[in-house]
């Protein structure tokens, strides 16, 4: 059975780039009747916050993602310690005592000599006495994973290709000799991303790892670690990344296009889903009405090689299309939460929906119709005409067709037509230059309110 995972770090509000990965995994699991695992990468105890864990759960629910299981890496430290000890005993995890400053100086020297800045495994040369001396100076070791890029002597590396058939990009190759042995454990004995991730993928029987192509190099290292643990390899698939229109990557620290902010601004969940999933693919970005329809057009192989640029203007356009197609029953509860209810609520929604881009913008038109207004939008030269229009307002209850009857009579009497006929009346009644059909607005306003607004001096 297909089993995928989404492993966010709860160190901030997740953004559109994060959620794209979540949606790719979720839709892939749905397409293959598999399972979707939510795994919080909360090994950074200081920066991980419960408020972000809660926010991620809310974001996923809003996007229609329902995890089959939830795990916390912070509750699995004993398991990571167990695996780390096995690797140490096998000589695959070795202690290093260089400081960050020493490593940086070494890197600069390598670059000045036009050499690749690869860690030289100097720590492997340390004797037991030298290690003891380092620790007596107060130095604590960080631990590196010994990459299998040598035959007998780890100080004599050779080209060692790790190959895999990527589910998105096809055959991929990483030369382990071109990489430094990765640090898996910091000086303070906390874990970096790699070891917990691989251990969890093994223990949780993850079959497919779908993520951004900035992880391709990591994959070479992780495959080596999977093999070191005698574990079965999952299928890897690397999709193109999302960037801003300026080509910058998204960041949780900058709160860039967080899902929370998009939701609070009033964007439709399905609009966010459609754009996040379809942008940067061979598929047209289409406003599918629900996730099931989006799933029918989802295919990992459709993603392009280049970075996809996410433009908020595209999201606004997509959102508009979707809102214009929403029926009253689709939004009834949300409108009620906006204090839009009553016997005219459905008629109101059908009248104004094609003139708004977000459901919450309906509040503006509800207030225009129901609240006391003091519009001053009519030009001075049109005010006499507005006053005159009262004499031609149809008798009785105003209906949709009343607008046509009214303006026809005014046109015949005054000679006005087009914009000079319609605009002053719209401005006097709504304070706006544009909006829903005036016939529908007349019915919503009612005769008494229409007369009151037209009578203002």
Swiss-Prot record:
The alphabetized list of GO BP terms reads: glutamyl-tRNA aminoacylation
Which cysteines are cross-linked by disulfides? none
Span of the annotated motif 'HIGH' region:
8-18
Gene3D superfamilies, per the entry: 1.10.10.350, HUPs (3.40.50.620)
Q: Which UniProt keywords apply?
A: Aminoacyl-tRNA synthetase, ATP-binding, Cytoplasm, Ligase, Nucleotide-binding, Protein biosynthesis
Question: What are the binding positions for ATP in this chain?
Answer: 252
Stated EC number for the protein is 6.1.1.17
Where's the motif 'KMSKS' region? 249-253
* Compartment(s) where it occurs, according to its Swiss-Prot or TrEMBL record: Cytoplasm
Q: Which reaction does it catalyse?
A: tRNA(Glu) + L-glutamate + ATP = L-glutamyl-tRNA(Glu) + AMP + diphosphate
Record-level GO cellular component terms: cytoplasm
Q: Does the keyword Nucleotide-binding apply?
A: yes
GO MF annotation list: ATP binding; glutamate-tRNA ligase activity; tRNA binding
Subunit and partners: Monomer.
Q: Tell me, in a sentence or two, what this protein's role is.
A: Catalyzes the attachment of glutamate to tRNA(Glu) in a two-step reaction: glutamate is first activated by ATP to form Glu-AMP and then transferred to the acceptor end of tRNA(Glu).
**Which family is this sequence assigned to?**
Belongs to the class-I aminoacyl-tRNA synthetase family. Glutamate--tRNA ligase type 1 subfamily.
From the Swiss-Prot or TrEMBL record, give the protein name. Glutamate--tRNA ligase 2
Q: Which species is listed as the source?
A: Bartonella tribocorum (strain CIP 105476 / IBS 506)
The top of its lineage is:
Bacteria, Pseudomonadati, Pseudomonadota, Alphaproteobacteria, Hyphomicrobiales
């Amino acid at each position: 059975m297909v089993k995928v995972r989404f492993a966010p770090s709860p160190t901030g509000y997740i953004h559109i780039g994060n959620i794209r990965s979540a949606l790719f995994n979720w839709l892939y699991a749905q397409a293959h009747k598999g399972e979707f695992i939510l795994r919080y990468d909360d090994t950074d105890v200081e920066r991980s916050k419960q408020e972000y864990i809660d926010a991620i759960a809310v974001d996923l629910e809003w996007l229609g993602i329902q995890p089959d299981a939830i795990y916390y890496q912070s509750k699995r430290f004993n398991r990571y310690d167990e695996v780390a000890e096995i690797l140490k005993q096998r000589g695959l995890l070795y202690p290093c005592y260089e400081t960050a400053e020493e490593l940086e100086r070494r890197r600069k020297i390598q670059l000045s000599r036009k050499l690749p800045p690869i860690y030289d495994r100097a720590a492997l040369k340390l004797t037991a006495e030298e290690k003891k001396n380092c620790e007596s100076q107060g130095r604590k070791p960080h631990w590196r994973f010994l990459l299998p890029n040598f035959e007998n002597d780890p100080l004599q590396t050779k080209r060692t290709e790790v190959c895999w058939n990527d589910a998105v990009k096809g055959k991929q190759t990483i030369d382990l000799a071109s990489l430094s042995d990765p640090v898996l454990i910091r000086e303070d004995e906390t874990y970096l991303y790699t070891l917990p991730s691989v251990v969890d993928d093994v223990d949780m029987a993850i079959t497919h790892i779908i993520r951004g192509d900035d992880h391709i190099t990591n994959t070479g290292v992780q495959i080596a670690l999977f093999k070191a643990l005698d574990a079965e390899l999952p299928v890897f698939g690397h999709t193109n990344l999302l960037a801003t229109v300026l080509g910058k990557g998204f960041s949780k620290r900058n709160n860039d296009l967080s899902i929370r902010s998009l939701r609070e601004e009033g964007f439709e969940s399905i609009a966010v889903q459609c754009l996040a999933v379809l942008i940067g693919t061979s598929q047209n970005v289409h406003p599918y009405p629900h996730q099931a329809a989006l799933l029918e057009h989802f295919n990992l192989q459709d993603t392009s090689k280049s970075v996809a640029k996410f433009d908020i203007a595209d999201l606004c356009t997509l959102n508009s299309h979707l809102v214009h197609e929403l029926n009253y029953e689709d939004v009834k509860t949300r409108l009620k939460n906006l204090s839009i209810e009553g016997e005219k609520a459905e008629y109101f929604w059908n009248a104004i929906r094609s003139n708004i881009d977000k459901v919450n913008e309906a509040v503006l038109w509800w207030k225009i119709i129901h609240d006391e207004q003091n519009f001053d939008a009519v030009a001075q030269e049109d005010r006499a005409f507005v006053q005159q229009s009262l004499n031609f307002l149809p008798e009785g209850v105003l209906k949709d067709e009343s607008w046509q009857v009214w303006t026809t009579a005014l046109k015949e009497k005054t000679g006005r037509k087009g914009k000079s006929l319609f605009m002053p009346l719209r401005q006097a009644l709504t304070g706006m230059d544009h909006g829903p059909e005036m016939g529908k607005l007349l019915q919503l306003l009612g005769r008494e309110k229409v007369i009151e607004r037209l009578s203002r001096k």
